[in-house]
Curated annotation (Swiss-Prot):
GO terms for biological process: maturation of 5.8S rRNA from tricistronic rRNA transcript (SSU-rRNA, 5.8S rRNA, LSU-rRNA); maturation of LSU-rRNA from tricistronic rRNA transcript (SSU-rRNA, 5.8S rRNA, LSU-rRNA). Component of the NOP7 complex, composed of ERB1, NOP7 and YTM1. The complex is held together by ERB1, which interacts with NOP7 via its N-terminal domain and with YTM1 via a high-affinity interaction between the seven-bladed beta-propeller domains of the 2 proteins. The NOP7 complex associates with the 66S pre-ribosome. Gene3D superfamilies: YVTN repeat-like/Quinoprotein amine dehydrogenase. Residues 395-431 are annotated as: Required for interaction with YTM1. Pfam families: BOP1NT (PF08145), WD40 (PF00400). Residues 20-48, 65-110 have a biased composition (Acidic residues). It comes from Yarrowia lipolytica (strain CLIB 122 / E 150). Belongs to the WD repeat BOP1/ERB1 family. Residues 282-395 are annotated as: Required for interaction with NOP7. Component of the NOP7 complex, which is required for maturation of the 25S and 5.8S ribosomal RNAs and formation of the 60S ribosome. Keywords: Nucleus, Repeat, Ribosome biogenesis, rRNA processing, WD repeat. Residues 1-111, 545-585 are annotated as: Disordered. It is found in: Nucleus, Nucleolus; Nucleus, Nucleoplasm. This is Ribosome biogenesis protein ERB1.
Length: 820
């Protein structure tokens, strides 16, 4: 019995060994255990193995036919008998049977196993390529074992999002391969052991019809891709689906309607739930609450926390019948509603009164105006009935402009500044305490035809010299306004381009004055005005220069290398010789007629002279010709009849130039900047940046530390040289361009500005000896009296040498004296 059982076990094991051979054509097995055998031995072994496989197939087919023919009852009986026989086996016999089929070792195959397996199956080792070895390293890790032999340990599998966490095992392991790939094959996939899963048999059309009529239990009409059969659901799954559809709980164990258990009932118990003693904090005042209460008390005392006023229940509420609806919700404090459009007026009515209807002249005038200049966008019309009123054509445009107004003009809430207006006004002394200063016109000097452009007072203060567009130079008596001297400097009256631009009395040589007309500068000693000694001194001062020039002495120019760092070195020609610079002006002897009128010398420049100023010693004269480029500024010496240009390169259009009252400095004002040059050190000492667009004139304080500038952009700028290169004060009191500004040279703290608006502004300016105290500027008076002609007002102002008197020259052809 035992031997028959062992034989049956052998057959079963042999059948299990033979099963993988059926699919030998689907696997590529490479390499054998005996790698050193020759090719002939391999071929012989393959032939023997093929014969054994054929025999096994025949035996297997016979066995299967016999098993199919057996009855089910006989199979059950044999199975019970077989189970009983296995239980009767002793332990030693069972161990012998198991040892018979066990391996002899890990590395070698026992030859006895190959001998007993008469089917000729040979064990083969799988030899792997380099690519397969790399893939194997990603899955397993080879480490040395305890016996010193290599041991393969599989790496830990990390669950990711795509990992499957279901408990149901997949019978078909094709993965993501679609079932359509197996349409032409008899199987539909492979199981976990690599065996084919055969396609299930399909019924006929009649069977399918019967299935749709008599639906089996759990029928879904779906196809299971893993088995190819119909997918049916169980009763439990169907019940779960019904619960989900009814929004019920899926767990039968949970009851959402359990009975209420009153853990804490309304009945008062005698014994407490907890017998712990009361904590100390229950009967001691809280320190934190005391701090909060004190903060609230302080806030109430300071008025930050206000209590609600008590409402009188008997008081009757007052309502504003004209106010908006009180039940509306109040807007947020930061909400700003759009301003409402103005209500329509009487002229917008379809039947306005007659006085609101425009005349034909008014309609023509309205049509002639530009749309942006019209007061209203419609013309009032009258209709007999409202049904006759046509559609309003401007409605779309008005809505669009309304939208633009709301979009481009955002509403912003600004906090109101509670500032006392008096605190914004500087604390200045009263003008009455700063007397004297000019307040009225005392004398008017008439006689010029056209604009009066130049004005100057001699150092004695008795005579006034003026020049204008008529080309004449006139000398007036200050007190009486009588004309004492007249000299025509322009040959023809029709010469519109030439006019007397500047007139200046010599501060050191009495009786001598300089006047410019066009490109010429005239040195004049007016006859019959002064006594013989004064007149003779002035003529000798001019004539001694002719003798110096005739002596053949060379003129020594001022070294101007340091005045202009960017000077061009173009004075050398191609041969390397130094070119001799041509003088910026020529000295010409006047004719006999001109000498009879008092002209002692004529200086001819290259361009029109716009400004001239004397040095304090009276020997040097600086002139400005803006269109002469780098020769715009020229310095002329009277005693030597020499002229020189201190600059080799132009740094802007020069507007004015002056000597410092007592230092060897030259102030040059361009359109944007004022440069101060030190003539002794031959360097630029300072550069002022007034910030004006176009500087018109320049004047220096008698103390030499402050400068005022006038500009065409309606500003008067005060510069403190000890403070900064930026303006100390910017005064904007004029409505048009400021033409000229001047300090009082006689020691009075006064200065003024003249503008094209026809006004003269008088200011008080005190300069303190203390360097820590800023100058005090106080506006005093606005003098009005000149007329504006062709957009031009007052062109020039000049202070009296000693008195608080002011002289002005304007475009209306007159000069005026303003006194206290």
């Amino acid at each position: 019995m035992v031997r028959s059982r062992s034989n049956s076990v052998k057959k079963d094991l042999k059948r299990k060994v033979d099963e993988p051979v059926d699919v030998q054509d689907e696997f590529d097995v490479e390499g054998l255990i005996d790698e050193g055998d020759s090719d002939d031995e391999d071929e012989a072994e393959q032939e023997v193995a093929q014969e054994n496989v054929t025999k096994d197939k025949k035996n297997t087919s016979k066995t299967e036919n016999e098993e199919d023919a057996d009855d089910e009852s006989d199979s059950d009986a044999e199975l019970e008998a077989l189970i009983g026989e296995e239980e009767d086996l002793s332990g030693s016999e069972l161990e012998d049977e198991l040892a018979y089929f066990s391996d002899a070792g890990d590395d070698e195959v026992d030859p006895s196993i190959l001998k007993h397996l008469d089917d000729g199956v040979r064990l083969r080792s799988l030899s792997r390529s380099s690519d397969q070895t790399d893939e194997l390293k990603d899955v397993v890790e080879i480490v040395p074992g305890a016996d010193g032999k290599p041991r393969m340990i599989k790496k830990e599998i990390h669950a990711v999002y795509d990992s499957d966490d279901s408990d149901q095992e997949e019978s078909n392991t094709i993965g993501n391969v679609p079932l359509s790939a197996y349409d032409q094959m008899p199987h539909i996939g492979y199981d976990i052991n690599g065996k084919r899963i055969m396609r299930p048999a399909t019924g006929s059309a009649l069977d399918n019809l019967l299935e749709t009529i008599d639906l089996p239990e759990g029928w879904t009409g779906l196809l299971d891709k893993s088995t190819g059969k119909g997918l049916n659901i169980s009763k439990e799954e169907l019940e779960l689906i019904k619960r989900i559809q009814k929004n019920e709980t899926t767990d039968d164990a949970s009851n959402p309607y359990e009975d209420l258990v009153e853990w804490f009932s309304s009945k008062t118990e005698i014994m407490p739930l907890s017998a712990a003693p009361e904590p100390k904090r229950r009967f001691i005042p809280s320190k934190h609450e005391a701090k909060r209460v004190m903060k609230m008390v302080q806030a109430i005392r300071q008025g930050k926390l206000l209590t609600k006023p008590k409402e009188d229940p008997d008081a009757r509420p007052n309502y504003d019948v004209w106010a908006d609806n009180l039940t509306d919700v109040q807007d947020h404090v930061m909400t700003l509603r759009a301003p409402k459009m103005p209500p329509p007026t009487h002229d917008e009515s379809y039947n306005p009164p007659a006085e609101y209807l425009p005349t034909e002249e008014e309609i023509a005038e309205w049509n002639a105006l530009a749309p942006s200049e019209r007061e209203r966008n419609y013309v009032p019309k009258k209709y007999t009935a409202l049904r006759h009123v046509p559609g309003y054509s401007e409605s779309v445009r008005e809505r669009f402009e309304r939208s633009l107004d709301l979009y481009l003009a955002p509403r912003v809430r600004k906090n109101k500044l509670n500032i006392d207006p008096d605190s914004l006004i500087p604390d200045l002394p009263s003008p009455k305490d700063l007397m004297p200063f000019p307040i009225r016109c005392a004398t008017t000097y008439k006689g010029h035809k056209g604009k009066v452009r130049a004005i100057s007072v001699d150092p004695s203060g008795e005579f006034l010299a003026t020049g204008g567009d008529d080309g004449t130079l006139r000398v007036w008596e200050v007190l009486t306004g009588r004309e004492l001297y007249r000299c025509r400097l322009v040959a023809s009256i029709d010469a519109q381009d030439d006019s007397v631009e500047c007139v200046q009395w010599n501060p050191a040589v009495p009786g001598m004055l300089a006047a410019s007309a066009g490109e010429h500068i005239f040195l004049i000693v007016p006859p019959t005005l002064f006594d013989f000694d004064i007149e003779n001194t002035g003529r000798e001062k001019i004539e001694q220069g002719w003798g110096f020039a005739e002596g053949g002495r060379e003129q020594q120019d001022i070294d101007t290398k340091g005045l202009d760092d960017d000077a061009d070195s173009d004075s050398d020609d191609e041969t390397g010789h130094v070119k001799k610079k041509s003088p910026p002006a020529k000295w010409i002897t006047p004719t006999a007629k001109q000498q009879a009128s008092g002209i002692g010398a004529i200086i001819t420049a290259t361009k029109t002279i716009k400004r001239l100023a004397w040095h304090r010693k009276g020997d040097y004269l600086v002139t400005v010709a803006p269109s002469a480029q780098h020769r715009a500024v020229a310095i002329h010496q009277i005693s030597k009849h020499s002229s020189q240009s201190p600059f080799n390169k132009s740094k802007g259009i020069v507007q004015d130039a002056m000597f410092h009252p007592f230092r060897p400095h030259l102030y040059v004002a361009t359109q944007r900047y004022v440069r101060i040059y030190d003539l002794a050190k031959q360097v630029m000492a300072k550069k002022l940046m007034p910030g004006a667009r176009w500087v018109s004139s320049l004047d220096i304080h008698p103390r030499g530390d402050n400068v005022i500038l006038s500009s065409f952009d309606k500003r008067l700028l005060w510069h403190d040289l000890d403070l900064s290169d930026k303006p100390y004060k910017t005064l904007r009191y004029h409505e048009k361009a400021v033409r000229h500004a001047a300090f009082h040279k006689g020691g009075l703290p006064l200065f003024c500005s003249a503008s094209d608006d026809g006004n003269i502004n008088i200011f008080h300016g005190t300069v303190y000896d203390d360097m820590m105290t800023n100058p005090l500027l106080v506006p005093l008076k606005v003098l009005k009296g000149h007329d504006v002609k062709s957009g031009l007002g007052i062109l020039r102002v000049e202070w009296h040498p000693r008195e608080a008197w002011l002289f002005s020259a304007a475009a209306d052809g007159t000069a005026k004296l303003w006194t206290t």
